[in-house]
Each structure stands twice: as C-alpha cells, then as structure tokens.
Amino acid sequence: MDSSWFEKISKEHEVVGLIAGNGPLPVLFAREAKARGMKVVAVAHEGETLPELEEMAWVVQWVRVGELRKLIETFTKRDVKRTLLLGGIDKKRALKELCLDDWALRLIQRLQQRGDDTLLGALAEELGSHGICVLSSQELLRPWLAPEGLITGPAPTEQQEADVRLGIEALQAMGGLDIGQTVVLKEGVILAVEAIEGTDQAIGRAGLLGGPGAVVVKGSKPNQDMRFDVPVVGSKTITTMAQVEARLLALEAGRTLLLNPPEVIGLAQEKGVILVGWKARGGDGKD
C-alpha cells in the first residue's frame, strides 16, 4: 500500500471510514492505518468480511448487504468525512440474502440499470449527500497495480500473444453489458467468460472444457469507476490456474490489482504460470 497516501490522509483526518467486503484487503488496510495512529470506523458485511477486522478497527458495525441506513448512520455518528470501499461482495450470496432497507430501496429506484458500477457510483453519491467523500482505493493501492509487460516467466509464444489480444477484444466488447472481467481462451477459442460465479470458478470451468494450456485475460470494464472497484488477482487465482494447468495470466496494467505482489509473483514462478501486463490500445492505465 502507498505510504504517502496514509501520510496525506492522516494529516487531514484522524478518523477514516471503511466499507469492508470480503478478502484480506480491509484487514490489511485497517492494520496499516492503526499502526499509523489512525482510527478506522468500519462497516463490515455479515458472511463476507473477515472477523479479524475487529482487532484492527476502532469501531466495527456489522450489517447485511442492503442495510444502507445503518451504514450511513454509523459514519455520521462518528463524524466520518472520508471513507474507502475495500473488498468484494459475493454476488451469489447477495442475491439470496439481500436485505434492502427503505434507504436502499429509494436508492435503487433512482437507478435505470442494475450494473455493479452504477450501484457503487450511486452509493458514492448518496454518501456524498451526507457529507461523506469516497476516497480512491486506486491511489492507496497503486504500488500493487500490475505493471505493463512481462512480470514473470518466459516470454509468451505467438499463439499465447494472439489469445491475449483476442481476450482483450472480448473484454472490451462485453464491457458495456456488465458481464465479468475475465475471459479464458485456448488457441483462438474462448472457453469461458466470467459471470456471477467469479474469476476462479470461471477458470476452473474452462479447464474442464479445454484442458491444459489455457490463457486467462483479466481487466476492467470500459467505464469502471476505479475509485472503489479495482479488479483483483490473488494467490488463489494462481493456484486455480495451476490446478487446471492454465499457462498464462494477462492483467490490465495500472487497472488490475496484484494482492500482495511478492506472494503472487513468487507463487506464479513456483507453479509455472506466466504473468504479463497489458494496456488497452490508446490507454494509459490511469484515470
């Protein structure tokens, strides 16, 4: 994580909010913030957020997905003016256990489409109306964003490079449809497209269909709000690829997060997975 980000925010605000989803990111952030003398007021999601967050945050309020009023009041009661969104929410669980309060229902009624990006953008606007600014997680996590070019492993073959190009084209074509952020290919054939199951299960499905040698391409959606919705790859993805003998993982440079880069890169080297970073044609990897 970017130490200069903490230095800047801690000078301006002793208390910072955290809307915590699943995975290790919320806990890692809260631990770093606590070590720097900051107080984290966290809204954690039942069944999603790691309980270890309670050891690191100053305040933790547990909510169900959709309890917007409780979320906002947790922040306003502690005079939180800045907050981050870190970690994801399992879409399958959210569909089954969604608990929309009256505030959330009004928010959704104002939306014309139900894509993740739109919902998160609307949430940021709603928080802003209560005097709470959503900070960019991309700035905080910049040191962990994938670089362009070969990250580890041997240079890709011509066929692998062709598969990466096709995967990028597919991702860009699907971006406006709010489909997932991952495409799995082999020798010019698309084996799987990520949907609600998530990246790792899409890779597993592709392995069953196409066998060894697949190429995985992951990136952001064209209009994705990178303040709080950065695509993430961790060690679990590398392990899943190794299990189905997928050979190469191509990540959008500057817009895809390597969760603990030394660990991910080291595991990729151990498992024989090539890592590369790509940039969209004409893109600069920044917002």
Each language-model region and where it sits:
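Catalytic domains of riboflavin
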Residues: 1-4, 19, 26-28, 125-135, ...
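N-terminal basic/disordered segments at the start of proteins
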Residues: 2-45
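Short coil/turn connectors at secondary-structure junctions
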Residues: 11-15, 36-39, 57-58, 78-81, ...
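Conserved mixed alpha/beta catalytic, RNA-binding, or beta-rich assembly cores of soluble enzyme
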Residues: 15, 33, 62, 117, ...
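General beta-strand structural signal in soluble alpha/beta enzymes
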Residues: 18-20, 42-43, 83-86, 116, ...
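Short glycine-rich anion-binding loops that position phosphate/pyrophosphate groups of nucleotides
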Residues: 22, 88-91, 189, 221-222
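Feature captures the catalytic cores and cofactor-binding loops of soluble hydro-lyases/lyases
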Residues: 45-80, 97-106, 115, 201-287
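N-terminal glycine-rich phosphate/adenylate-binding segment common to multiple enzyme folds
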Residues: 68-141
